[in-house]
């Protein structure tokens, strides 16, 4: 989502609160809970859940491995739910032509650098760079090249934009900032 006027452009960035992240965190939680319950059932020698008999699974080595996978899956699921809760990666890009300043804000993980805030002068922007890699794992990234700072990604790699959409966004941003476009 974005908002534009003649001198200001604000681009809101979605973080980890995407439908796919909710889906995978939920599926991973259910799957790992199932593995842990089957491993626990094989250790106790009786069914904790009645969906399938776990007496056929002996504790050593299958029950131990299933318990380990269940615990590992619960930790990964907990990590995913925490990133969703904290909305890691969300924020905004603000381009202000009147003041000549670019502000980039993102939420990070809790701690010292929870708030990631970058500020640049517009005159330090060298170009808008598009990196397109086609193939099985297609990658389309939009960067802002800053003098003395290097390239700063503006669009995440997991946002599934087509090449045309990336080019359109790069052209609009380059026109707004009055800088050239580089394609890699």
Swiss-Prot record:
The chain crosses the membrane at residues 22-42, 57-77. It is found in: Plastid, Chloroplast thylakoid membrane. GO terms for biological process: photosynthesis. InterPro entries: PSI_Ycf4_assembly. Keywords: Chloroplast, Membrane, Photosynthesis, Plastid, Thylakoid, Transmembrane, Transmembrane helix. It is a multi-pass membrane protein. Coiled coil: none annotated. GO terms for cellular component: chloroplast thylakoid membrane; photosystem I. Seems to be required for the assembly of the photosystem I complex. Belongs to the Ycf4 family. This is Photosystem I assembly protein Ycf4.
């Amino acid at each position: 989502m974005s908002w534009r006027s003649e001198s200001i452009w604000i681009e809101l960035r979605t973080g980890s609160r995407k439908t796919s992240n909710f889906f995978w965190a939920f599926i991973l939680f259910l799957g790992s809970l199932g593995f842990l319950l089957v491993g626990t059932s094989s250790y106790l020698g009786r069914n904790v859940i009645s969906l399938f008999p776990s007496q056929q699974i002996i504790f050593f080595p299958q029950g131990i491995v299933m318990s380990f996978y269940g615990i590992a899956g619960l930790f990964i699921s907990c990590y995913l739910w925490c990133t969703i809760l904290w909305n890691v990666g969300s924020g905004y890009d603000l381009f202000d032509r009147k003041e000549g300043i670019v502000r980039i804000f993102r939420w990070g993980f809790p701690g010292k650098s929870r708030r990631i805030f970058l500020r640049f002068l517009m005159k330090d922007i060298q170009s808008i760079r598009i990196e397109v890699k086609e193939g099985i794992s297609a990658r389309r990234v939009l960067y802002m090249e800053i003098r003395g700072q290097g390239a700063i990604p503006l669009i995440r790699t997991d946002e599934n934009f087509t090449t045309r959409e990336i080019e359109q966004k790069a052209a609009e941003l380059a026109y707004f900032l009055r800088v050239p476009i580089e394609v890699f």
